[in-house]
Amino acid sequence: MINALGLLEVDGMVAAIDAADAMLKAANVRLLSHEVLDPGRLTLVVEGDLAACRAALDAGCAAAMRTGRVISRKEIGRPDDDTQWLVTGFNRQPKQPVREPDAPVIVAESADELLALLTSVRQGMTAGEVAAHFGWPLEKARNALEQLFSAGTLRKRSSRYRLKPH
């Protein structure tokens, strides 16, 4: 369980690195994660006890203002479990989705047709585009794409599925 969180949003990578260094040196905190929001805008998340998070954020703000701009800062004492999950999501470790055991397995012919289609579309396709092309329900298209993605045949970027380069 996390005792307290400190969040610092800054403009500029140099300001973020400077702020993170100052926060870690100023107090007994641990850098939990960072998130690049827009080009040049970063959020740093530290954890520790509440007083340490406050001291770290004070030092981080001072350092970031020397080299960039501080957008916002926030200390959260005893964060709720859902808030912890959100921070864990920032850390690229989301909760594992529960797979439905009765998810239909695509047949080989459908998989071959889908792979042939994805070979011809260089920029990849979304589940909605696949569903419209084959006349499938959206859930069937999503399941087919996810099965091929799980098998390592496809790669996924945002909502687009593409063939993996060989």
Curated annotation (Swiss-Prot):
Metabolic or biological pathway, per its Swiss-Prot or TrEMBL entry: Amine and polyamine degradation; ethanolamine degradation
A GO biological-process term: response to X-ray
Source organism, top-level taxon: Bacteria
Compartments in which it is found: Bacterial microcompartment
Disulfide bonding pattern of the chain: none
EutK-Ctail domain boundaries: 109-165
Transmembrane region(s): none
InterPro entries associated with the record: Bact_microcomp_CS (IPR020808), BMC_dom (IPR000249), BMC_shell (IPR050575), CcmK-like_sf (IPR037233), CcmK/CsoS1_BMC (IPR044872), EutK_C (IPR032298), WH-like_DNA-bd_sf (IPR036388)
GO molecular-function terms, A-Z: structural molecule activity
Alphabetical keyword list: Bacterial microcompartment
This protein's GO CC annotations: ethanolamine degradation polyhedral organelle
All copies of domain BMC, residue ranges: 4-88
Family label: Belongs to the bacterial microcompartments protein family.
Subunit details: Monomeric in solution.
Role according to the record: Probably a minor component of the bacterial microcompartment (BMC) shell dedicated to ethanolamine degradation. It might bind nucleic acids.
Protein name in UniProt: Bacterial microcompartment shell protein EutK
Source species: Escherichia coli (strain K12)
Gene this protein is translated from: eutK
